[in-house]
Amino acid sequence: MANAAVKSADTVLSITRILDAPRERVWRAWTDAEALAQWWGPKGVTIRVLKLDLRPGGMFHYSMAFQPGHEMYGRFIYREIVAPERIAFVNSFSDPAGGITRAPFPQLKNLWPLEMLNVVTFTEQNGKTTIALRAHPINATEEERAMFVANTAGMQQGFGGSFDKLAEFLTK
């Protein structure tokens, strides 16, 4: 697959979820450090918010603990914030200081894109909020885009778990 040309339309991850909560509440869950710590990340992962600077150019820096003693780091660099309608950010794996790093998974053979642009929109109808996430690699090589496409199912599962946690968080 690394040698196959990957069309840009093929490299977009698109996930939509309807949540039983008003848009303002869902927006706060995406923009409040305490809330993010409770629902962001795959199921079974403990999130620690290291920094949340919610403004264009600001950073959300976090650690993910899968088990005691095994931490990974990630970050968002916000590009656009239009409350309560839209958030755009570049997501990357990071080191403890917030610098970009390669994905820490050997099976990805250092071919995971360093940066992904994510755009999340929030629309409300009848007291329920639809979140629509679209993500794609940026500044990526052909091989990195191919690896992104090859792992779409895993990303669907990972974001699905996060959005399940978000739905549960919103019931509290």
Tell me what each language-model feature is:
Residues M1-T46:
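Hydrophobic ligand-binding cavity/cleft-lining segments
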Residues S14, E34-I77:
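Short beta-edge strand/loop motif at the mouth of beta-sheet-based domains
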Residues A5-S8, T31-E34, L50, Y62-M64, ...:
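Charge-dense, helix-prone N-terminal extensions
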Residues R17, V49-L52, G74-E80, E115-E124:
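Hydrophobic/aromatic beta-strand elements that line small-molecule binding cavities or substrate pockets
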Residues R23-E24, D53-R55, R79-I87, T121-T130:
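A short, structured loop/turn motif at beta-sheet edges
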Residues V26, L36, F60, Y78, ...:
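Hydrophobic pocket/interface hotspot
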Residues D10-T16, R23, M59, E71-Y73, ...:
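Intrinsic-disorder/low-complexity, polar/charged segments enriched in Ser/Thr/Lys/Arg/Asp/Glu/Gln
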Residues N91, G99-Q157:
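Beta-strand/loop substructures that line and gate deep hydrophobic ligand-binding cavities in soluble
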